[in-house]
Every structure is written in C-alpha cells, then in structure tokens.
C-alpha cells in the first residue's frame, strides 16, 4: 500500500513537472522574405499617394475659392457674399468627407490594406501552426509585436527561418 501511494505521488509529480514548450517568430523578418508582401505594400502606397493627390487638389480648390472671395468681398452684396461663403463651406465639407472616405478607419485604404495583407498573415499563421504542431510546441509568440515584450530569447527557440522555409523561401535572401 505504501508503495502504491509512493508510486501515485511520483506519477502525479511527473505530470505536474511536464513543462509546456514555448517558441517565437519574428514576423517582420519573415515578411521581408515574402515578395507578395512587398508587392502589396507598393500597391497600398501607390493608392495612398493617388488618394492624397485628389484630396490635396480639393483643398487647393477650397483655398483658391476663399482667396478669390476675400479679394472680391468688398464688392459683393450680402446675398452674393453668403452664397460664396456657402459654396466654400460646402466644397470644404466635400473635401473632408473624401478624406474620411479614403483614409478613415473604415476607409478605402484601410479596406484595401486588409484585403491585401490578410491572406499573407493567414499564410504565416498556418505555417507557424503546422511547425508548432510538428515540434509539439504549446505557445508561439511574435517577437516583433509591440504587445509582446521579450527581454531575452535564445535563438534556439526562434522558428522564423523554419516558417520562411515552410513558405517556400530562402532565409538568407530578403526582398529589397
């Protein structure tokens, strides 16, 4: 009976002592190896510049209207003045609305960014998951995430190169 209790105690200690395995990846490092990421960023940047140009042109037009109004203000009747003021205000509202529609939290640029980058993120997540399952790893942290603070991590726990290889790229070559 004593042996049975001792054996049970040792078995329970053994289960409690089985440590969980941790690893980490550096998604910024992984993304630098993916040509589709660079291509997506180029598309997003191009669209951003195009939108910004349209918005800048709208605000330049508002500025021109305002300067013309200031120059003509003395010569205008009250009705004409109010009409021009309303035109300027309306044009400025439209420019601000365009800015919100293009760059706002639910704007076209945000939607485009999500559409282009989500498949890349899912591809990385799938590769990380497969590698972690294959190596019996319980938790994988992202070293490049601002919410994960890693003061020290041994490179032996870094799965980044494994992920790059799993995705079909070479770890020693980055996309420029």
Predicted features, each with a name:
Residues 4-15:
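Sec-dependent N-terminal signal peptides
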Residues 20-176:
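Amphipathic, charged alpha-helical segments and their helix-to-coil junctions
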């Amino acid at each position: 009976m004593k042996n049975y209790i001792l054996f049970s105690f040792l078995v329970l200690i053994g289960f409690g002592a089985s440590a969980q395995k941790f690893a980490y990846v550096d998604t910024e490092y992984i993304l630098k190896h993916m040509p589709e990421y660079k291509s997506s960023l180029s598309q997003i940047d191009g669209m951003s510049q195009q939108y910004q140009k349209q918005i800048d042109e709208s605000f330049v037009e508002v500025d021109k209207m305002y300067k013309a109004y200031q120059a003509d203000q003395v010569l205008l009747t009250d009705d004409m003045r109010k009409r021009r003021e309303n035109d300027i205000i309306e044009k400025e509202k439209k420019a601000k609305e365009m800015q919100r529609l293009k760059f706002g939290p639910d704007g076209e640029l945000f939607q485009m960014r999500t559409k282009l980058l989500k498949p890349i993120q899912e591809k990385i997540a799938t590769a990380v998951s497969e590698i972690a399952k294959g190596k019996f790893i319980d938790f994988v942290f992202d070293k490049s995430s601002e919410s994960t603070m890693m003061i020290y991590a041994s490179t032996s726990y870094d799965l980044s190169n494994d992920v790059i290889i799993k995705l079909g790229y070479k770890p020693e070559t980055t996309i420029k």
